């Protein structure tokens, strides 16, 4: 019986992990795409004196978005760890 419960918990953790990996992977990819677009457009803006200050702003915002990448990863890890701890608490309470 205990082996089945562990198997069920492992299955639940895998399902949860896949759900959150997909969700955060989309956020991460969208963020990367926006960063790339900002740096590309900012680079072209540097060819024109009129648009140079807008290009600087795009670089600054793109750099800020680079800081969001590890933040997304930390939030994902925090939520996943929280879920794992809850599963193990649930498992230990049913073992008693």
Curated annotation (Swiss-Prot):
Location in the cell: Cell membrane
Mode of membrane association: Multi-pass membrane protein
Swiss-Prot/TrEMBL keywords: Cell membrane, Membrane, Transmembrane, Transmembrane helix
Transmembrane segments: 27-47, 52-72
Record-linked Pfam families: YrhK
GO cellular component, one term: plasma membrane
UniProt name for this protein: Uncharacterized protein YrhK
Species this protein is from: Bacillus subtilis (strain 168)
Chain's gene name: yrhK
């Amino acid at each position: 019986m205990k082996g089945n419960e562990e198997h069920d918990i492992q299955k639940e953790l895998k399902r949860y992990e896949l759900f959150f990996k997909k969700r955060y992977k989309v956020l991460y990819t969208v963020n990367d795409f926006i960063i790339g677009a900002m740096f590309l457009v900012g680079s072209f803006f540097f060819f024109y004196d009129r648009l140079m200050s807008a290009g600087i702003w795009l670089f600054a915002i793109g750099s800020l978005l680079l800081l969001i990448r590890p933040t997304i990863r930390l939030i994902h890890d925090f939520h996943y760890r929280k879920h794992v701890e809850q599963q193990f608490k649930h498992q230990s309470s049913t073992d008693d």
